[in-house]
Amino acid sequence: MRIDDPSNAVSDLALLGLMQLISPALPIGAFAWSQGLESAFELGWVNNEAQLGEWLEGVLGDGLTRCELPVLARLQRCWANNDGDGLAFWNDWLHANRETAELSDEDTRLGQALIRLLNSLELQPQKALGHVELPEEPGYVTVFAWTAHQRQVPVRQALLGFAWGWLENQLAAACKALPLGHTAAQRLNETLRPQLVAAVDKALTLTDEQLGPILPGLALGSAQHETQYSRLFRS
């Protein structure tokens, strides 16, 4: 089947594999990172449920939609086509668009952790089987794309799963650090769920020239988080 055809129905095994990949229980340490959200709390930019919803809408619309989601689609197609040059290009592109040391470190360390897990499960790319090799310093999105491809998850479903995992992680961070009640987190989940679908729809239409995050506030907050006195998260 064509793995990048949005009309493909995801198989039961592929769906279960995607659910495992985006599970909060996946032992890659995603819970330790907030992607700059903790700094937004500390600086007083986000103080309540409504403000958190606005923050997440902004990061989704100006960040994931224009950066991680469309590049994830490109990376998964590179894996499907054994395109090592394409993998290296988009992996480097993502690294170049991590605007602070913490955001870059988060992407790299989560990628390394996922590779270690894949090695333990014997799911890593293997040259002997005809797989193209991982690029140098593969980031999380690059390794996520490999795992989705290896499990025959169609591109659209992989993007939806990635976006869902991002939202779950952000809400979990807010429950710990804002603090936000779990019921409030579920209200935001309900509100933002349709926007995840819209984000994936848009991400799949963007040309290469239209890509690139527009998140100056997130970058400033993340930079200040590096010297924040009291922290729960590594980013």
Curated annotation (Swiss-Prot):
Keyword Cytoplasm: yes
Subcellular location(s) of the protein: Cytoplasm
Top-rank taxon, per record: Bacteria
Single GO molecular function: nickel cation binding
InterPro entries per record: UreF, UreF_sf
Keywords: Chaperone, Cytoplasm, Nickel insertion
Gene3D superfamilies noted in UniProt: Urease accessory protein UreF
GO cellular component, one term: cytoplasm
Pfam short name (any one): UreF
Job description of the protein: Required for maturation of urease via the functional incorporation of the urease nickel metallocenter.
PANTHER family: UREASE ACCESSORY PROTEIN F
Family to which the UniProt record says this protein belongs: Belongs to the UreF family.
Self-association and partners: UreD, UreF and UreG form a complex that acts as a GTP-hydrolysis-dependent molecular chaperone, activating the urease apoprotein by helping to assemble the nickel containing metallocenter of UreC. The UreE protein probably delivers the nickel.
Full protein name: Urease accessory protein UreF
Species of provenance: Psychrobacter cryohalolentis (strain ATCC BAA-1226 / DSM 17306 / VKM B-2378 / K5)
